[in-house]
Amino acid sequence: MKQIYDVIVVGGGPAGIMAAMASGKLGADTLLIEKNGFLGGAATASVLGPISPFHYKDEQVINGIPQDFMDRMVKEAGSTGHMKTLDPYGSGDSLGFYDREKYKYVAVEMLKEFGVDILYHSMIDSVDC
């Protein structure tokens, strides 16, 4: 593992995973630091519901790396993909149910493809610039 990185992402939950993938995809030397021994945060460590809507009304408003992740999950038989649902609150009418273990696997595989290093069982208590 290198000692100097262009970008360090702290926290391997859904947002941290996507941020690290984006950084790696753009060619930055990237390190993702996660306190647990696996990625996914609340999406894999708890009984969290489905992946939130990628749609607003009939339009898909979330694309890019999150959609690439969803596509890979479907390919690995780890997600239903976007399923049309009721929309009682007006927040989106599609959800993606997923397998927590496949989520962890797909996250690691995609991060590796983007050249991101992962440091597990680690926390940050200060940063000097």
Model-found features: residue ranges?
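Beta1/beta-strand and adjacent pyrophosphate-binding region of the FAD-binding site
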Residues: M1-A15
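A short, structure-level motif marking secondary-structure boundaries and short turns
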Residues: Q3-Y5, M18, S91-D93
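Short alpha-helical segments and helix-capping/turn motifs at coil-helix boundaries
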Residues: P14-M18, K104
